[in-house]
Amino acid sequence: VIKFLEKLSKGTPQHWASGSFKVRDLLKRWPATRPIRLLYIELRNSLRGLPRWRALRGADARVWTSACSSAKGPKVLVASSVGAHMIANSLDSMLAVALTLRGARVHGLLCDGALPACLACEANLWPDQQHFTKHGPSRTLCGPCFRPARRMWSGFGLPIHFLSRHLADEDRAACWRIAQTVAEAEIDSYEHLGVRAGMHARSGALRYFARGTLDEEPHALSVRRRFLAAALMATSALDRLFTAEAFDACVAHHGLYVPQGLLVDLSRKHNVRMATWNVAYRAGSFIFSHDDTYHFTLMNEPVTNWESLVLDEPLQAALDDYMQSRATGSKDWVSYQDNTGFSTSEMKERYGIDLTKPTVSAFTNVLWDAQVFYPSNAFPSMLDWLFDTVRYFARRHDLQLVVRVHPAEVRNPVRSRQTVVDELARAFPQLPDNVHVIAPTAPVNSYALARHSNAAVIYGTKMGVELSYMGIPTIVAGESWARNKGVTLDADSRAAYFALLDKLPLSGGLDEETRRRAARYAFHFFFRRTIPFEFLTVRKGAWPPFRLELADLAPLRPGRSPGLDLVCDGITKGTPFIYAAETLIRQGRSSH
């Protein structure tokens, strides 16, 4: 049954598909299939999606009992919160066990249906949006989300907190009253108990709709108010929990959306050490950050963490080997690139691109992903940047602009409901002759395109790290992680951005010293900031993309995994989340 449901949910045979439309897309639009999809979510999480800690604990009963009874270390809240998120609950629960084995007093956190909206809510689960605006997830998603996670977390014997137990009826009423009456223009900036509830509610609503703007969503305002109510309730409940328990540290995935973003703000308010994490690029590895989401910390990380790194022959060889693999994603969790389209003649024939002409490539990012306020952005949004860029190049007949739309628009598990191709077609019914758009489904490799470019312009894509490593001069207008590293041309205003464009075409690529600096940062980012866990089995093309391969608790004990030891020390002691990959490589040991 679960295999059949998985086929319905995740994909269809090729002969069932026509273009980008698949049977699964029809199922997502058909209200009658929602019970099947919800049943699939619960069965998947219950039967094989989440670790079976009760059995593993039994295999090491004496060790586990002793660890729990003797734990006298820091009090740590592992705040998975969203039960349906299999990656979060799998990794968080592993961290809970590992921290306990190192003496920490670990508590868990789950939402038990207390919130009227959250990270688990996506528009494709509610083909009838009025049902969601009226009832939220309570009648459909909350049960399948909560039940499997509760069973998994109960296998520890550790304290676990439920949001509803820290939320009084009067809190709910007050939060709903605020959410329904606050002026529309004030929703995004609304603060509650010193927390940026409105900002995180906005991020949640954009993710729900999988859109970067909500102008054309008829139920957008109702959904925004629902997410604001959820953010207010989560803030009230978590503020009460933090006051009562006096945690020393907190662990939360993402550090964005509802309720995870609120945990970051509340940890800061209560002087609780916060560690956020997310899946990294390299297969089997994760990114951890202190005190904020990695979307902020990676932009503002001190350059002293990496600029003096010496890339000797073993390190340079490891970096070059990995960076070459990025074109196909063979060493990553997932690849958004096709190993096709390398021929310049093919690009010219299929897309009208003449790479003998000075070419500037614009690489987009997913419109809705991680949309929070970035003070250094030169434009209000990626679409504003892209539209103004096209208008600029319409006047520059000496140059050619190629817009490569991010393949994740259609390959991401949360498929975008607003696409760059559609928005460009709406804004420019007739594109300028020197502007070409490559759709996310097109068999063109972004790295091959970059190699033929005089320069690149980006907004928030993470590809800025690779572009600089490749020696491509890159102008950054948004929140790319390559910003502030001394390897890109960073614009903090529209005027500064266009002044940089006026210098195009450039006479050559990045100078040798800047390329060496870019290589040092690329090694730091891909090898030192991404932390591997050896006991994970990577499952490419599956969900979740990894499985904990544990016969007992031994691999999680201190001294067994350098990456796990590093992460646990970072959570409990505040030490940097920087993995000593260079040491392992120089010793001839694989770091990933």
Regions found by a protein language model. Give the residues of each.
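Histidine-anchored nucleotide/phosphate-binding helix
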Residues: H85-G108, D112, V264, F379-A394
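Conserved N-terminal ligand/cofactor-binding loop architecture of enzyme catalytic domains
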Residues: V1-K75, A79, A98, R102-A231, ...
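Donor nucleotide-activated moiety binding/catalytic core segment of transferases
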Residues: L228-A244, D354-L355, S376-N377, R415-V465, ...
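A donor-sugar binding/catalytic signature common to diverse glycosyltransferases
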Residues: P259, N278, S285, A442-L489
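Conserved nucleotide-sugar donor-interacting segment of glycosyltransferase catalytic cores
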Residues: A234-S289
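Conserved catalytic-core segment of nucleotide-activated headgroup transferases in glycan assembly
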Residues: A327-R426
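A short, glycine/small-residue-rich beta-strand->loop->alpha-helix junction that serves as a flexible
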Residues: S81-L91, A252, Q371-F373
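Nucleotide-sugar donor-binding patch of glycosyltransferase catalytic domains
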Residues: F288, I475-R520
